[in-house]
């Protein structure tokens, strides 16, 4: 936050994005298929957007399967391959494998309120355990970010 502290609304949105990022990270594992991963992350995001009052259950009930309601506030993908190129190309129809590196970068953008929050981690898939977070030493909890901004 530019002023050193998040407003109450910014804090609520930040925490929602952080929860989505954390849940999305746990879903990345060898054998997972891209479309299933993105569908599951979409469910988590939908729940958070309902909690923030940005969507309601009627929006979700009336959504078209090809254009989920959450896309109004989260219009990009959650993850992409990471390699030699910034947005490295990878096979989207084959299962994820151990050793692959992915971004995890959900965001919520609220133009009518004049702000958005996007968080990103880069992770390496491992068998039988959560992905290894290459950015694990960077402050990401809201309180840590505010503390750093006020140091």
What are these regions, as identified by a protein language model?
Residues 1-151:
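Active-site neighborhoods and metal-handling regions in enzymes and metal-associated proteins
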């Amino acid at each position: 936050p530019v002023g050193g502290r998040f407003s109450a609304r910014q804090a609520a949105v930040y925490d929602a994005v952080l929860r989505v990022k954390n849940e999305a990270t746990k879903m990345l594992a060898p054998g997972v298929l891209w479309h299933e991963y993105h569908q599951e992350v979409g469910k988590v995001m939908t729940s958070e957007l309902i909690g923030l009052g940005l969507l309601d259950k009627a929006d979700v009930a009336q959504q078209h399967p090809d254009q989920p309601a959450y896309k109004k506030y989260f219009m990009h993908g959650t993850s992409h391959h990471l390699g030699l190129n910034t947005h490295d190309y990878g096979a989207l129809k084959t299962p994820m494998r151990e050793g692959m590196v992915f971004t995890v970068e959900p965001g919520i953008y609220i133009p009518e309120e004049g702000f958005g929050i996007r968080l990103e981690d880069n992770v390496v898939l491992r068998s039988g355990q959560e992905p290894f977070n290459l950015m694990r030493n960077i402050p990401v909890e809201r309180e840590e970010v505010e503390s750093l901004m006020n140091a």
